[in-house]
């Protein structure tokens, strides 16, 4: 059983420890280019932004476009990571068959020229990250099927995996899969082919383990980097929306009302980051929630066979996990902190939804689904404190929740960064450079009335006392 040991704290301290100054916004104008995942290169002071048809390289000081790198000859780019002047792009095969093997392509960040041949990895490489010493590159191959509307789910579904690339030879030395991996925890969705789809990877400080979110399975998988294999899969349990502090709005009825109700939310995290506190590793998770890529995995609580009454009648729930009177929705609408064994030590409860509503950026049209949908998380150390930045994919303006998580058992909500004119932050990058601290936000959806997506850079400053 996973226990909640910390109560969410929503009150903002009298004096905020951080302030945020918007430095620039870049509008991505190349046809088909979106703003999805940013990465910073300190050798050239540039921000690299992956977004479907290519990667835009932006001047870190001004936000102007340095170069657009087209990748359509390889497929569609999902992510970018940079280490010591080397950029790696995760590229899926794309139409007509995204189940085919993807590739990783490397670029020199100074010359912006390709290095070597593409490296073939698994199906739909969705995210990648270097180990701290740069010796390995880990690639999360999500392995989703083509037919998103296939209610019978008969389309071949490629297995999810993590490709491990040795950076000295730039070859795949192992592909970590999920067959026969020991399973622990609760509410683990265990259809290996359909549910075990890696989303995001975080590496612990000593570089011995990686923690992989397996969103549709409601799990974290632990990857041993000496064995290059998964050693355990941990089910993350479910959030009880009937408990005080876990209020949510289950109806898209034009009125925002946060209530406690007899329903549960499968955590199903997307983004994950790791940090140390008192010589122990903790994981920070953005509990977005996601159904499988087929309509058979979702239902409406008021319909047969559930027949839930208002206010739960419009709630979207999991067909796989729910039964009449026992409803499970996708996502926890929160940020959580867990020990590496899956123990829940903090959950933000209803804070992200309610704070978005307080700032008039809560979208009631998403209430029946997953609320603000916490998507990504990035951690920044400033002045001896550790701060978590949590991107909210489904607000009416780009919104980032900010928490002080220095002590994981006493995490505190601090602020929410709202950027009018931007929408749907997909990826975040935080970095220190030349004595300053920065937050880059990749917003993947054009704002209302706009035709392009934006990347925005903020400077993060400590409050002066």
Functional labels for PLM-detected ranges:
Residues 6-8:
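N-terminal signal peptide c-region/cleavage motif recognized by signal peptidases
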Residues 12-464:
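Beta-sheet-rich non-transmembrane sensory/scaffold domains
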